[in-house]
């Protein structure tokens, strides 16, 4: 019998480093259907969010701006282009988004999820990090002997062949990064990645049986 898993894949852009305001959040909620042999049957986006907020800080961080180009003028423009109902000006006031992150059944996924989790300020029950889980998959040499560095999103995407080199210029947009992370997760499920299947609740015995040929 097949089982449907709810995945919440997300990314944020901020006004600086840890503890600063969230300027944008992008979320893709996906139903992943997996059969009893742990084959991925379908990977369907149910709903997505792409929202922009103002910082509570008095200034926009120059270093962060260089990465994502979000300032008051651009945020004004992007909020005006939003076609759905209006939403709060500040991230921590957005109850609809907060309710998404309060889901106790979903698996929350991000690249470097520890960083994003701190910004949300809501305990996430089940999480998975595409960065940490792929360090030993990509095996990019780390700074010390016999270590691997944590791969960047672009490095992970290139490994799973879900990005072309000429697409690099569009990075640091939360919407694009979320879509790219979703493609990485799709590839990982297709290949029956053990860490991801474990995060979804499958037992060691189930995974062993499904990965034997």
Task: Give residue ranges: language-model regions.
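Conserved non-catalytic scaffold segment of RNase H-like nuclease domains
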Residues: 2-124, 154-159
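Ser/Thr-centric signal marking residues that sit
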Residues: 12-15, 130, 181
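Active-site donor-binding loop signature of nucleotide-sugar glycosyltransferases
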Residues: 53-54, 130-132, 162
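Active-site-proximal helix-loop-helix substrate-binding element of RNase H-like nuclease domains
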Residues: 59-77, 135-179
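Acidic, Mg2+-coordinating catalytic module of metal-dependent nucleases/exonucleases
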Residues: 104-114, 119, 152-213
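Conserved beta-strand -> loop -> alpha-helix junction used to position metal-binding or nucleic-acid-contacting
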Residues: 125-139
């Amino acid at each position: 019998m097949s089982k449907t898993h709810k995945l919440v894949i997300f990314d944020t852009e901020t006004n600086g480093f840890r503890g600063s305001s969230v300027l944008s959040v992008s979320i893709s909620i996906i139903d992943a259907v997996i059969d009893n042999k742990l084959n991925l049957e379908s990977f369907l986006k149910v709903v997505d969010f792409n929202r922009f907020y103002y910082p509570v800080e008095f200034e926009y961080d120059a270093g962060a701006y260089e990465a994502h180009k979000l300032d008051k003028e651009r945020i004004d423009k992007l909020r005006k282009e939003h076609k759905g109902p209006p939403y709060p000006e500040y991230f921590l006031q957005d109850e609809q988004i907060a309710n998404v992150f309060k889901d106790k059944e979903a698996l929350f996924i991000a690249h470097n999820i520890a960083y994003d989790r701190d910004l949300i300020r809501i305990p996430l029950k089940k999480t998975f990090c595409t960065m940490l889980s792929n360090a030993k998959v990509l095996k990019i040499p780390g700074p010390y002997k016999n270590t691997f560095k944590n791969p960047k999103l672009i490095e992970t995407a290139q490994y799973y062949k879900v990005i072309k080199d000429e697409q690099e210029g569009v990075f640091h947009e939360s919407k694009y990064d979320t879509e790219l992370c979703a493609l990485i997760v799709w590839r990982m499920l297709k290949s029956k990645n053990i860490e991801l299947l474990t995060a979804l609740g499958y037992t060691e015995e189930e995974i062993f049986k499904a990965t034997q040929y």
